[in-house]
């Protein structure tokens, strides 16, 4: 396990992931001076998901909502071990952090798709476009992907909280439809924090606040942290036509019960 026993205990207490000798606090409320202000976050939260991310896009990479480099690096290492891919899709690509990962494992093309024009604009500016592989950006809804079965690999990082549980069957069916036979859908999923962890109650409080907000305010802003559960994900992927395996991302260690703190889901289109 990475880090000292004291660090591991601290990470277990807070429900976080030890990484390279430090805790990987993806969702802790820590913002750089270049990040959004509280007022800007409030305006975003009272907007639709699409409009909210358009507003947040210029400062998104300076928030803790961006997938940590430690997670991106771990997934990249696993993908390289699976071999080389021709065409890759970054689902809900945001500012392109996952697209950078795909550029290292795909030979011919990489496509980032997102429904926020603002996030795509930032992605175009920050991700290298000189190929190979060729990099393309598409504005579109992950629930109605504008592609045929052309991809060998699809990845997604940190976006599933924007989909309600009832939307997962349709979402996974869409991904299945754009993969070639044998194509893989790969993404990390973290273990939930223990109820003894303050982080468990912080996430519960956040999700509860969002449910109240969505009951009282329109348009809704779907963003929940406790709805994407491992068992539900595995079941719905199987129903969508995938063969599902999961691997421990060993860089992040294990919980006291021996289960991995972070898993990599590898779903293969059959």
Tell what function each PLM region has.
Residues 255-270:
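Core SAM-dependent methyltransferase catalytic element
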Residues 224-241:
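Short alpha-helix
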Residues 169-181:
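A short glycine-rich, Lys/Arg-flanked "PGG" loop and its adjoining helix->strand segment in the class I
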Residues 89, 95-144:
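Class I SAM-dependent methyltransferase SAM/SAH-binding core
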Residues 155:
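A conserved beta-strand element that flanks and buttresses the S-adenosyl-L-methionine
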Residues 29-83, 101, 186-210:
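Conserved class I S-adenosyl-L-methionine
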Residues 242-253:
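Conserved S-adenosyl-L-methionine
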